[in-house]
Amino acid sequence: MLIWLVELADHFQFFNLFRYITFRTGAALFTSALIVFLFGPAMIASLRIRQGKGQPIRADGPQTHFKKAGTPTMGGLMILTGIVVSSLLWADLSSIYVVSTLLVTLGFGAIGFYDDYLKVTKQSEKGFSGKARLGIEFVIAAVAVFFMMQAALSAGAAGSTFGSSVTFPFFKDLMLNLGYFFVLFGGFVIVGAGNSVNLTDGLDGLAIVPVMIASAAFGLIAYLAGNAVFANYLQIHFVPGTGELAVILGAVIGAGLGFLWFNAPPAAIFMGDTGSLALGGLIGTVAVATKHEIVMIIIGGLFVIETLSVIIQVFWFKRTGHRVFLMAPIHHHFEKKGWTESQVVIRFWIIAVILAMVGLSTLKLR
């Protein structure tokens, strides 16, 4: 919204700063962090009163988790408020990529909110029906992917299939054109990303920091992919307009920092599905928009590992009646092995940093 103030640059030189994505990214980060810091305490107090018993604790979970009983959830409302308000202020709302990303973020956030609501009111781990939830998520994601695909096709040269193609790291010219099946592929990527972050959110601070790390990595990717000069130098695919996504990702980092202030152990609030689904969906949408869906598997490798641990556990238990892990997702396995919560969280943060660096290295290895 504030980018329109660039029109005043002829009279007030200061407003020329609003042209630059880097300036607006920094401003978005600061704004979202400030919003969460200022309004966080009031939101936490309100949620604690309204929820009473707070988020239900898994009966089969580690014993150390029972002391968290009564902690309110839906902290994602704080994060989403910071992200959305900051993005509306600093991002270019004429960009279909910005609009699509915010659509997915709010849509997934609403689904997560309803899921949290059911869990709190019923005091049960079972919330929204799994199949129904996945179905609605996929519809939202597919709509966003369709519009982004059309934008990429329109921006490309006549006859170009880039908008409907999947690109691969390490190979600058390798593309797989999926046609309109790209909508299904992109929808799967976004839904998978949302639910992977959701599965990771099981310990204080465990999900939010890797989300910020992935956001920083994809913020750089979005900025580079949206700049013709840098994209040509790195031999990555140029996607006009995606640079604006760096502004949204800056807002994610700022809101994440603000939330971590209250989510640091012992957590005063949990982000809940409201936050984890929305943040995962946001990152997945950026990956699709910038044509780095495969790279997301590396950068978001921690989320992939958490998801695979659940899939393996369920598959093997149904097949043999035995468990591969003491408990899934895998962060609970390590707790059962004797690791303290802080050891699990910090070691997983380290893994997230390493994976993000490996993912970014693919930009130059072509």
Curated annotation (Swiss-Prot):
Annotated catalysed reactions: UDP-N-acetyl-alpha-D-muramoyl-L-alanyl-gamma-D-glutamyl-meso-2,6-diaminopimeloyl-D-alanyl-D-alanine + di-trans,octa-cis-undecaprenyl phosphate = di-trans,octa-cis-undecaprenyl diphospho-N-acetyl-alpha-D-muramoyl-L-alanyl-D-glutamyl-meso-2,6-diaminopimeloyl-D-alanyl-D-alanine + UMP
Q: Locate the transmembrane regions by residue number.
A: 27-47, 71-91, 93-113, 138-158, 174-194, 205-225, 245-265, 268-288, 297-317, 343-363
Q: Which GO terms describe its biological process?
A: cell division; cell wall organization; peptidoglycan biosynthetic process; regulation of cell shape
Could you say which EC number(s) this protein's record lists? 2.7.8.13
Describe the function of this protein: Catalyzes the initial step of the lipid cycle reactions in the biosynthesis of the cell wall peptidoglycan: transfers peptidoglycan precursor phospho-MurNAc-pentapeptide from UDP-MurNAc-pentapeptide onto the lipid carrier undecaprenyl phosphate, yielding undecaprenyl-pyrophosphoryl-MurNAc-pentapeptide, known as lipid I.
Recorded hits in NCBIfam families, A to Z, give: mraY (TIGR00445)
Q: What is this protein called?
A: Phospho-N-acetylmuramoyl-pentapeptide-transferase
The gene for this chain is mraY
